[in-house]
Amino acid sequence: IFTQRLNSPLGPMILAATAQGLCGVWFEGQRHGPSDERMRSWTHAASNGLLENARQQLLAYFAGEPHRFELPLDLSAGTAFQQSVWQALLRIPSGQTQSYGDLARLLNKPTAVRAVGAAVGRNPVSIIVPCHRILGAGGQLTGYAGGLWRKHALLKLEGHMGL
């Protein structure tokens, strides 16, 4: 796994990639992020085309440019169910949100709301796989591994009308 750091307006981030694609985008210290021990086995990549492309796309996103991420992803660290949830998140357009229940119904698992929530919380590719676009049933901000203040900031950046 190759890594780079990115200083974002919402705090330092870690970007990680395998030969197959981007496998991680985390805010430093976020819940469910990689441990320091695990990261010690990774290789810092001063020059890596995929990581550099991810960096540029994220900087454009943070600058408020209309954006759709175009990056190969490696989501193989998740279970089949988690991967299905993460793929469903990719279909939620910028500026829109869904509830955990909406996402469970979309996956034809209407009784699996808690399992969907757990998978959303374990998303390893923050922002690009837009788990921040998932809200509680009443439209309230709930759970975000990077902190609710970041979730609010990301939704505001995307022009979510409810904020």
Predicted segments with their positions:
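Basic nucleic-acid-binding alpha-helical/helix-turn surface characteristic of O6-alkylguanine DNA
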Residues: 1-111, 157, 161-163
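Regulatory, non-catalytic segments
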Residues: 114-123
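Major-groove DNA-recognition helix of helix-turn-helix-type DNA-binding domains
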Residues: 128
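Short cysteine clusters
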Residues: 131
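…primarily DNA-binding HTH/wHTH and HhH modules…
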Residues: 137-163
